[in-house]
Design a protein with these regions (language model features):
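Conserved phosphate-binding elements of NTP-dependent enzyme cores
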Residues: 1-172
Length: 172
């Protein structure tokens, strides 16, 4: 079925919950196959391994509830690890979980043209105020942050409705 579709956006909200490490590797392989078929994968996730394979990372935070809702970071994994404002990056860097074991592939990814991005400007959703970000298409995009920080809000209340609006009159 995947060979019949391209230019679709697949959204997963914490798909690794309860999975064994071997199952997570299979999940990652599925994400990569979806992208290789010309689609976009957006993942809201806490798992270090899943975050590490994202071509582009968006972190919302810094805390939960009223302490969250701010854009902390957007960019590639290597830059993410060096983000001083990121609680998640600090944990990953201090745990040395991926730095030695995985060479991230964003450095070799082609530069995307502006028409290959989904842009959100000035979104106000739940505790997110005036959120603006650009999400590259045809990549794996990870949304990270502590529980309750607002990771799912831009996906569920902005990206999904906008994609529905854009695709309403298109036959797929």
């Amino acid at each position: 079925i995947m060979s019949d579709f391209d230019s679709l956006t697949f959204i997963f909200d914490e798909p690794s919950v309860g999975l064994h490490e071997r199952e997570k590797e299979k999940l990652i392989q599925v994400f990569q196959e979806i992208v290789a078929a010309g689609n976009t994968v957006i993942v809201v996730e806490h798992d270090e391994r899943i975050i590490s394979i994202a071509d582009y990372i968006v972190e919302i935070g810094p805390g939960a509830g009223a302490e969250g809702g701010k854009l902390i970071f957007q960019g590639n994994y290597n830059d993410f690890l060096n983000c001083k404002d990121s609680i998640i990056a600090k944990y990953l860097k201090e745990s040395n979980y991926f730095i030695e074991n995985y060479k991230h592939h964003m450095d070799t990814a082609p530069i995307l043209h502006s028409d290959n991005k989904l842009c959100i400007r000035g979104a106000n959703i739940n505790n997110l105020k005036n959120l603006s970000l650009s999400i590259p298409l045809y990549r794996i995009v990870g949304f990270a942050g502590v529980s309750g920080s607002g990771k799912s809000s831009p996906v569920a209340h902005t990206i999904v409705p906008k994609l529905k609006q854009i695709l309403r009159n298109r036959v797929i």
